[in-house]
Amino acid sequence: DIVMTQSPTFLAVTASKKVTISCTASESLYSSKHKVHYLAWYQKKPEQSPKLLIYGASNRYIGVPDRFTGSGSGTDFTLTISSVQVEDLTHYYCAQFYSYPLTFGAGTKLELKR
C-alpha cells in the first residue's frame, strides 16, 4: 500500500495569512501513460461530507476559491491557502488514487491562533 505522510498535524493560523500543508507519498504518484499525478486534496468539516478541493495535484475543482492551490510532483505535494478565511478553519486531507487501496494522509487541522 502507498503510505501518505502529511504534515503538520495541527496548525494555528492567523486570518488572512498564507498556509502550507505538505504531503509525501511512499512512491511516485505520476502516471506517464496518462500524464497526471494521482493526488487529491479534500476539506472535511464536521457533520459534512468531504469536499474535493484539488485533483491531479494542481487542478482546482469546480467552485473552489482560487485561494486554494495545489502543487508538487512525483512524491511531494503541497496545498497552499493564500489567505486563510474563518470558514477554512477545519480538517484537510491528501489522498492518492494511483493504486488500490486508495490511501489518505492522517490530516491537518487548522485552528485560529489565539
Swiss-Prot record:
SUPFAM superfamilies: Immunoglobulin. Gene3D superfamilies: Immunoglobulins. Residues 95-103 are annotated as: Complementarity-determining-3. Residues 24-40 are annotated as: Complementarity-determining-1. Residues 63-94 are annotated as: Framework-3. Keywords: Adaptive immunity, Disulfide bond, Immunity, Immunoglobulin. Residues 104-113 are annotated as: Framework-4. Anti-phosphocholine antibody. PANTHER family: IMMUNOGLOBULIN LIGHT CHAIN. This is Ig kappa chain V-I region S107A.
